């Protein structure tokens, strides 16, 4: 299992805006432990991902569809690695040529 670097960003932001306390500390520590375990399985957003995300953004805009930039960046990473994507927000990725799985509805 891999995770896109954009997901690391999203989770880090969520943890940093949480009120300080036991829950925030528990979740932050757990996430750091997870990152240490998968450190070589974090897919970065590089030039190829940027080009693919730009193409997707342009196609969406031509169709009048506006997407969240972070989701489009994740899509670029998924397309670069020809990967499958597990997400709760499967409708955000219904126009990419990749297998998208919603584990919450399976």
Role assignments for model-derived ranges:
Residues 1-76, 95-98, 104-106:
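PIN-domain endoribonuclease scaffold, especially VapC-family toxins
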Residues 79:
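Short alpha-helix at the nucleotide-sugar/activated-sugar donor binding site of glycosyltransferases
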Residues 88-92:
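C-terminal structural segments of small proteins and small subunits
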